[in-house]
């Protein structure tokens, strides 16, 4: 059976239709609308993709099991938006709504870099940090559907203020926006290029940034004990040349490294399609 999935991003909505073999056979993109127009745009995209008996949607933020957006920092005004219930009523099909990083993790686990594993964590390093967790072959959602908000894992008590209103969140130290702050406004590409040329300031920034990435990955490993950690998001292209440094610092930060098999650190393979593909794959769970 074909499936349709839509990934809602901060600037665009990306929809795909998958055939029975899981290949993308149709795509459509729309600018992300204001929160009060989101349901209408998602319904239009679903129709343009040909429709089917179910729809999967990935949305940034805190999503309830019923498909209600409780809060989404990257979508102004998106508080208590009833996406799932409204789409079910409007389209007359089954609708499954999940956090966007969770559906990307599901895609990488089912058909991407973590395929074949039973225990995996995906970390998306972008403007912020998102994630998804698979344990025992099951996607983990938690009691309220909020599992995987790893960017708001506290790594420094009373540290830098986060957009969530708290302090010391991991994404304030290991995200794309954190790298820009650390470097004094440089892009990730420019920072790593300068470090490769031997510029001392850039090398210091990269050392601190990779250390914060490693600290967070080690904490996730100590909690989840995964076989593989998939790293995706916009920052991954910048750090790919220093993954050996990240891996070494990650190993140093692990609890009881001599008694455990270290999880593999791999980069995501599905690119910007991961969220939409994961949404389509997860639609069958509706």
Where are these regions (language model features)?
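Conserved A3 ("GATE") glycine/threonine-rich loop of ANL adenylate-forming enzymes
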Residues: 11-12, 103, 127-130
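Short beta-strand segments
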Residues: 7, 56-60, 98, 122-128, ...
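A charged helix-plus-loop insertion that forms the helical arch/lid used to bind
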Residues: 68-80
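Structural signature of FAD isoalloxazine-binding scaffolds in flavoprotein oxidoreductases
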Residues: 146-149
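Short hydrophobic alpha-helix segments
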Residues: 28-30, 73, 143
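Glycine/small-residue-rich loop that forms an oxyanion/phosphate-binding "nest" at active or ligand-binding sites
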Residues: 72, 96-110, 122-123
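ATP-binding/phosphotransfer module of carbohydrate and carboxylate kinases, centering on a glycine-rich
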Residues: 1-54, 63-68, 85-93, 107-117, ...
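Adenylate-forming
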Residues: 104-110, 130-133, 152-153
């Amino acid at each position: 059976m074909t499936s349709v999935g839509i990934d809602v991003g901060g600037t665009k909505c990306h929809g795909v239709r998958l055939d029975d073999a899981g290949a993308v056979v149709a795509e459509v993109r729309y600018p992300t609308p204001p929160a009060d127009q989101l349901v209408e745009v998602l319904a239009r995209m679903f129709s343009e993709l040909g429709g089917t008996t179910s729809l999967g949607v990935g949305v940034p933020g805190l999503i309830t099991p019923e498909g209600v957006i409780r809060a989404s920092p990257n979508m102004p005004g998106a508080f208590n938006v009833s996406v799932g219930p409204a789409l079910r009523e409007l389209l007359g099909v089954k609708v499954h709504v999940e956090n966007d990083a969770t559906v990307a993790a599901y895609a990488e686990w089912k058909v991407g870099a973590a395929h074949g594993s039973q225990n995996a964590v995906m970390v998306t390093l972008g403007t912020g940090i998102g994630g998804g967790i698979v344990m025992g072959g099951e996607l983990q959602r938690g009691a309220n559907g909020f599992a995987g908000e790893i960017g708001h894992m506290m790594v420094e008590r009373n540290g830098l203020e986060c957009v969530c209103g708290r302090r010391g969140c991991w994404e304030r130290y290991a995200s794309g926006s954190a790298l820009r702050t650390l470097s004094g406004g440089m892009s990730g590409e420019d920072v790593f290029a300068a470090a490769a040329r031997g510029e001392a300031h850039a090398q210091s920034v990269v050392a601190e940034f990779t250390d914060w990435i490693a600290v967070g990955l080690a904490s996730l490993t100590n909690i989840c004990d995964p076989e593989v950690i998939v790293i995706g998001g916009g920052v991954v292209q910048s750090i790919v040349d220093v993954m050996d440094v990240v891996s070494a610092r990650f190993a140093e930060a692990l609890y009881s490294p001599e008694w455990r098999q270290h999880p593999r650190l791999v980069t995501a393979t599905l690119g910007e399609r991961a969220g939409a593909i994961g949404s389509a794959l997860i639609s069958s769970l509706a």
